[in-house]
Regions:
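Membrane-interface alpha helices of multi-pass inner-membrane proteins
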Residues: 38, 46-62, 68, 73
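Alpha-helical transmembrane segments of multipass membrane proteins
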Residues: 55, 76-77, 179
Length: 258
């Protein structure tokens, strides 16, 4: 379940901080500054902070960066299509993640490509996921129904919409890793490619919640607005109570997923 791995738990707060801090820093100009704890901090200092935090997260457990790294490529491509920025800008942004990239490559070489019988990675579509979850589509719908509604009906400002889009990209990469990748050997069903999904669920739910709260503060009282708010409240409540039921099942049965 999502809480039995202490290393992944220790990465959760850091991964959320990196994700949203990078979303802000990526939009900043080189000379721009932002207030943090009463001090004005420049983009370069924030880039260093993102790099250091990402290294710490990889050192604790690579589950965040193994999803965030490929998601970054998607962010850069979509941003280039929309803005036509110079390639130098993307190279500078990517350079922030060179240290954690070297660290995670070293970890993966040690874990998966050391020649040990318990190491190795292969493509095995839904093999590991279906081993733990007999109802994969229902599991996906249970955690994405609220974010889907928010993304479709609760449009907010451009910055929140961008964050929501990036959250979906992060979730999609995590889902694909869990769906397609499997370890070889005796760790095959340890679902180690699923820890990124645990982080992605938290990030996309938090992004959807922030956008929904922003939508609640709109100066509207029309019927469509009230129906959207009601549906959002119902889906958010459903996700909350499904979570309670899930942990009750974890505590009372050997089932890890549903």
């Amino acid at each position: 379940n999502t809480w039995h791995n202490p290393a992944n738990n220790s990465v959760k707060f850091i991964s959320v901080l990196i994700f949203y801090l990078f979303a802000v820093v990526f939009r900043m100009d080189e000379a721009e500054k932002m207030p943090i704890f009463g001090r004005m901090v420049g983009k370069r200092a924030l880039d260093v902070a993102v790099s250091v935090l990402t290294c710490v997260s990889v050192w604790l457990k690579p589950s965040f960066f193994q999803v965030f790294a490929p998601a970054l490529a998607v962010y850069f491509v979509t941003d280039f299509i929309q803005t036509r920025r110079s390639f130098k800008r993307y190279i500078r942004e990517a350079a922030v993640f060179v240290p954690p990239a070297f660290l995670i490559l070293y970890q993966m070489k040690t874990l998966f490509f050391s020649g040990a019988p318990s190491g190795g990675v292969e493509i095995a579509f839904l093999d590991v996921w279906s081993h733990w979850s007999p109802h994969i589509l229902l599991s996906i719908l249970a955690v994405t129904a609220f974010p889907i509604l928010v993304s479709v009906f609760c449009r907010s400002g451009p910055e929140m919409n961008r964050i929501m889009m990036r959250s979906w990209v992060f979730y999609a990469v995590a889902l694909l890793e869990l769906a397609f990748l499997a370890e070889t050997g005796n760790r095959r069903y340890n679902i180690n490619f699923g820890w990124g999904m645990c982080l992605a669920i938290g990030i996309i739910t938090l992004s959807a919640l922030m956008q929904f709260i922003s939508y609640l503060h709109l100066d509207r009282e029309d019927r469509g607005y009230r129906l959207t708010v009601f549906a959002g409240m119902m889906l958010l409540s459903m996700q909350f109570f499904l979570g309670i039921w899930y942990y009750w099942r974890v505590l009372t049965t050997p089932v890890q997923c549903f």
